């Protein structure tokens, strides 16, 4: 039996899909599952990330929340869930829903159906201005593990100016990421590296496997790189980088 979920964005007026549980981005007073975040810390300048990057970020947030909300033990085989996710999407993304659904099937081992609805993507959750006179040449994901640390060091040793992007949902992980980023700043200088730590938390989280977290990390990195123009590269120094 499939479970229907509806991701609602701030300011959206339409009614949710029938019988669908709602997930929302902290809409005040909403009777639904709140996804807590500080996405307003993400950059809206020098350039506002385009609708494709913002749409992908919203989709990744919805997928990650659904992955956390629905316990695998409730599935018929205690693993493979049937998930129907209704989500806001800019027009270019609507045609990609079948391809993204197949990607998610492979990534999480579930049966996904994405139901995009055409709506304007309010950029209001991306608000921060870039605080430095210099601009980065690259963005790198920075989980705080050894691979991401070595990847950042490799890029800095190559002379690049860098934004390292972290995601956390509890304080201990945030402190590890902040401590490592501070060490990079001390060694290479504050004009070479900037750390962007983004909090995304979902209090309703009975499921712990979370295979979709890599998609959310990728979406956060893409939205960050998009704020600095098409020439800004995104690096993913994870899972084996240190062995290269």
What residues fall within each predicted segment?
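Active-site-proximal beta-alpha loop/turn segments in soluble metabolic enzymes
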Residues: 202-207, 244
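Basic/polar, acidic-poor N-terminal "presequence/leader" segments
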Residues: 141-142, 244
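RNA-binding accessory domains that recognize and position tRNA/RNA substrates
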Residues: 1-139, 149-199, 206
């Amino acid at each position: 039996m499939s479970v229907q979920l509806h991701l609602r964005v701030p300011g959206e007026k339409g009614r949710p899909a029938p019988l669908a549980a709602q997930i929302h981005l902290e809409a005040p007073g909403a009777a639904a599952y709140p996804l807590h975040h500080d996405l307003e810390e993400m950059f809206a300048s020098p350039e506002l990330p385009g609708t494709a990057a913002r749409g992908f970020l919203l989709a990744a947030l919805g997928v990650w929340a659904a992955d956390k909300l629905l316990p695998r033990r409730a599935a018929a085989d205690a693993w493979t869930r049937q998930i129907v996710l209704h989500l806001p999407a800019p027009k270019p993304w609507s045609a990609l829903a079948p391809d993204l659904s197949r990607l998610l099937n492979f990534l999480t081992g579930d049966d996904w159906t994405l139901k995009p609805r055409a709506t304007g993507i309010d950029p209001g959750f991306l608000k921060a201005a870039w605080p430095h006179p210099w601009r980065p040449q690259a963005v790198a994901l920075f989980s705080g593990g050894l691979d991401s640390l070595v990847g950042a060091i490799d890029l800095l040793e190559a002379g690049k100016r860098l934004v390292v992007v972290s995601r956390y949902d509890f304080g201990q992980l945030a402190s590890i990421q902040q401590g490592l980023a501070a060490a990079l700043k001390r060694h290479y200088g504050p004009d070479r590296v900037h750390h962007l730590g983004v909090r995304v938390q979902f209090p309703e989280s009975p499921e712990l496997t979370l295979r979709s977290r890599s998609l959310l990390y990728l979406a956060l990195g893409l939205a960050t790189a998009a704020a600095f123009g098409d020439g800004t590269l995104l690096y993913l120094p994870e899972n084996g980088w240190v062995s290269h």
